[in-house]
């Protein structure tokens, strides 16, 4: 049977496609331009501030640069007397695109649906700011939550680090960094949604499912070169930090309970399957979902379809239990 999209996904995708497909990107900045145009089209809009309030904080990163950390919380959560679990969200975008502002609607939706405070880090983007900026900005934001837990009314023992796509890879790198730097208290939960983990990922050009990939090998190579450098990206013998490419980590011992999901038509499918296998090998508790017939960022390209609903239910269930 030929590889094909899930029928419901294919029908929904056809509704948002128009005209000729864009030419393959030639630079990381082209990816940023195209991604931001797509994000503005498919990401939900943030609700009014009386439904989900937004508060901005300033975090000092490893090099002294000030980073924006934005909280999304409902009035009910802000009135809570007991310290609340918190979600630190790291957006996707191939290391080269995405901002807290553009992703605000998705962050607000999580805060509204699960009734938890969501903190989104506006990490610096490659190629202007290559590794280690993104992961260090995210780690600094995690430290900020712990150091300011009392004034933020959050429980530092119940923090989930969540990311999707490149943000998922940065989330894994952040949690590895927290483990190795002996952050106390440790991260309670890791949620990596179709994470981008391995700069060495490579498929033969005739791999059948690649014709249905929404994030292609061309995108991937440009993104990794922007993030870790052209002289290192994709080269097995190059020295690439596991905080940048977590698939290169020697082990995952001591990582928190982890949620991972990915579609069968996602370029990251195989590296994510290997990540899950190694987590289990290192005795890390894992919940894993493999969604059939859908590619990268399927939930934004076809919102409301069954696999989007199933994925959202699974993710929200995990976040409510942090």
Model-predicted regions and their roles:
Residues 1-74, 233-236, 321:
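A glycine/proline-hinged amphipathic helix-loop "lid/cap" segment
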Residues 146-161:
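Gly/Ser-rich "nucleophile elbow"/oxyanion-hole loop immediately N-terminal to the catalytic nucleophile
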Residues 82-92:
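Short beta-strand element of the alpha/beta-hydrolase
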């Amino acid at each position: 049977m030929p590889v094909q999209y899930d029928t419901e996904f294919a029908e929904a995708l056809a509704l948002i496609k128009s005209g000729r497909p864009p030419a393959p990107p030639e630079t990381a900045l082209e990816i940023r331009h195209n991604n931001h145009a797509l994000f503005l089209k498919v990401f939900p809009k943030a609700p009014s501030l009386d439904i989900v309030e937004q508060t901005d904080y300033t975090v000092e990163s490893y090099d002294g640069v000030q980073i924006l950390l934005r909280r999304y919380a409902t009035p009910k959560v802000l009135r809570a007397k007991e310290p609340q679990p918190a979600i630190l969200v790291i957006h996707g975008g191939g290391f080269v695109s995405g901002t807290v502002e553009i992703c605000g609607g998705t962050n607000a939706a999580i805060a509204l649906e699960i009734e938890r405070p969501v903190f989104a880090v506006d990490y610096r983007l490659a190629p202007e700011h290559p590794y280690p900026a993104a992961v260090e900005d995210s780690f600094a934001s995690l430290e900020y939550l712990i150091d300011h837990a009392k004034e933020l009314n959050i429980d530092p023992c119940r923090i989930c680090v969540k990311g999707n796509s490149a943000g998922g890879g940065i989330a894994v790198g952040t949690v590895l960094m927290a483990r190795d730097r002996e952050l106390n208290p440790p991260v309670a939960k890791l949620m990596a949604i179709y994470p981008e983990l391995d700069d060495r990922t490579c498929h033969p050009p005739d791999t059948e499912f690649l014709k249905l990939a929404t994030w292609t090998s061309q995108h991937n190579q440009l993104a990794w070169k922007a993030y870790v450098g052209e002289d290192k990206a994709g080269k097995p013998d190059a020295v690439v930090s596991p905080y940048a490419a977590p698939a290169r980590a020697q082990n995952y011992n001591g990582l928190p309970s982890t949620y991972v999901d990915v579609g069968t038509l996602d370029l990251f499918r195989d590296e994510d399957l290997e990540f899950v296998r190694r987590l289990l090998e290192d005795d890390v508790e894992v919940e894993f979902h493999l969604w059939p017939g859908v590619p990268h960022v399927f939930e934004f390209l076809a919102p409301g379809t069954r696999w989007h609903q199933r994925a959202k239910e699974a993710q929200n269930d995990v976040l409510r239990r942090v």
